[in-house]
Swiss-Prot record:
Function: Short-chain dehydrogenase/reductase, part of the gene cluster that mediates the biosynthesis of melleolides, a range of antifungal and phytotoxic polyketide derivatives composed of an orsellinic acid (OA) moiety esterified to various sesquiterpene alcohols. The first step in melleolides biosynthesis is performed by the delta(6)-protoilludene synthase PRO1 which catalyzes the cyclization of farnesyl diphosphate to protoilludene.
Residues the record marks as active site: 161 (proton acceptor), 165 (lowers pka of active site tyr)
One GO MF term attached to the UniProt entry: quinone binding
Binding site for NADP(+): 21, 68, 95, 128, 161, 165, 194, 196
Pfam families: adh_short_C2
Catalytic activity, EC: 1.1.1.-
Coiled coil: none
Keywords attached to this entry: NADP, Oxidoreductase
Name of the molecule in the record: Short-chain dehydrogenase/reductase ARMGADRAFT_1018421
Length: 261
């Protein structure tokens, strides 16, 4: 795993860093020795302020930047701001994403466009402009995307979400091939259910008593439990490290053994 001595002076940018998996990734990378730029929407400013304070508390530099990852101009400006504030970009974690639980027939074209705009288009734009910055710097880098178990095995009620996450696997493989000659690796992580605010939202929609859904999901995992955000952050920490220098084009499951390749 990455260590402070190895990662000292390197810069990471994490999108969707206000809460859940993104926040856990940002804090883990800071503990690994990275200076960390945080991205989210302005509505999540309080969460970003809190995360930045936690990063600075472990002696790392940081900043936060508002941007909608589905908008190309905002992504370009975000990456330029990271370089201006922290001196470069070594690791890009494209974590921002949204979900939707709806039957296939009830999912509208507008629903589909909204989900894929953030999840798939947003990942494409972050891969593209982070990759360009890393090529300009000339010292390689790490790009890491957020796939899902639903990006490997479709699930009922998640048609738009599944489409976006299957697409991320394809983008990851193509980017790995094109960016590889520049010393840039591109991988993704694929969590199953994770105890996050998004998970809590689905529990509310389903209407099960608190804890019942988790018990049922735990039964589907070979290791008997679903993930915490920190479980995902550990995998990202490794993919961001120099020890992962020969891994690229891969989408790594982090689900306790729910989906197998």
């Amino acid at each position: 795993m990455a260590s402070t001595s190895v990662s000292q002076g390197r810069v990471a940018l994490v999108t969707g860093a206000g809460q859940g998996i993104g926040r856990a990734i940002a804090l883990r990378l800071a503990s690994d020795g990275f200076d960390v730029a945080l991205n989210d929407l302005q509505a999540n400013e309080a969460n970003l302020v809190s995360a930045l304070a936690a990063i600075e508390a472990v002696g790392r530099k940081g900043c936060y930047i508002f941007a909608d990852v589905s908008q190309e101009t905002e992504v370009e400006q975000m990456i330029s701001k990271v370089v201006e504030e922290l001196g470069g970009l070594d690791v890009m974690v494209c974590n921002a994403g949204i979900s939707l639980m709806k039957s296939f027939f009830d999912t509208t074209a507008e629903d589909f466009d909204r989900i894929t705009s953030v999840n798939l288009r947003g990942t494409f734009l972050c891969y593209k402009h982070a990759g360009k910055q890393m090529v300009t710097q000339g010292k390689g880098g790490r790009i890491i995307g957020a796939c899902s178990g639903t990006g490997k095995k479709g699930q009922p009620l998640f048609s738009a979400y599944a489409a976006s996450k299957f697409g991320i696997r394809g983008l990851t493989q193509v980017a790995a091939l094109e960016f590889g000659p520049h010393g840039i690796s591109v991988n993704a992580f694929a969590p199953g259910p994770v105890k996050t605010p998004m998970y809590d939202h689905f529990e509310t929609i389903i209407g099960t008593p608190k804890g019942v859904l988790e018990q049922e999901l735990n039964k589907t995992a070979a290791l008997g439990r679903i993930a915490l955000p920190e479980d995902v952050a550990v995998v990202v920490s490794f993919l961001a490290s120099k020890e992962a220098s020969l891994i690229t084009g891969q989408t790594i499951n982090v689900d306790g053994g729910i989906v197998f390749d």
